[in-house]
Amino acid sequence: MQNRRDQHPYNVAYYAAHREEEIQRVRIRQAATLDFLRDLRRQPCQDCSGTFPPWVMDFDHRDPHEKKFSLSAGKVLLKPRAALLEEIAKCDIVCANCHAVRSYEWVKANKATLTWFAVGVSSRIEEKRAYWKANVDLLAKLRDVPCLDSGRRFPFYVLQFDHRDPTQKRYTVSQMISHAGPETILAEVAKCDIVCANCHRDRTFRRRPASAGVL
């Protein structure tokens, strides 16, 4: 019997001879999984009862500690159906807005404060934490506005910065807290519209090719 190492040259030769067929087979499998995941999300949000397109809906793990993998990552499209169903069984299906609320409340309930995130032994750690908190407060204040698309008001943690022209994007605004000053943050924010998570998700979906990602 051939061992795995002996099999490798055969596998390489087979793929080289059938490359286009294999690529098409993978694409068909990915498309089928994408349709499957979207169909499961064609239902009202469990929290707000709102009805939204499937790309606005999320699988939210009830217990994050039981999460084996994200159901929104592109590589999930090649997971076996049994593995997907096992992971989906751990989740509630909620809209992106309600998912943002759940995530924020989980952080609060688990006392995941700035001190918890900003661990360190630097002699300047308290100074750094104050700097980061000032940036956190700045981003919260900037989001104290209605969603530009829906006109509705939401808690600041449901609102997001959406770059009007993705080619002009230098940074993800929410990730600038620890490494940028107020002027740099405000310069990046000036390129953005402030929209709720649901509207941001819808904008992003409409910009992408049909084959891009799970959304």
What are these regions (language model features)?
Residues 1, 212-215:
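Short intrinsically disordered terminal tails
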Residues 1-27, 54-58, 63-70, 97-131, ...:
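BZIP DNA-binding basic region
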Residues 29-37, 78-86, 131-140, 179-187:
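Short, intrinsically disordered, charge-biased short linear motifs at domain edges
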Residues 32-64, 89-98, 134-166, 190-199:
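Short cysteine-rich loop/turn motifs with clustered Cys
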Residues 68-98, 170-199:
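Short beta-strand-alpha-helix junction that forms the catalytic/metal-binding core
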Residues 74, 110-112, 176, 213:
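Residues in and immediately flanking transmembrane alpha helices
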Residues 91-111, 192-211:
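Short Cys/His-centered divalent metal-binding micro-motifs
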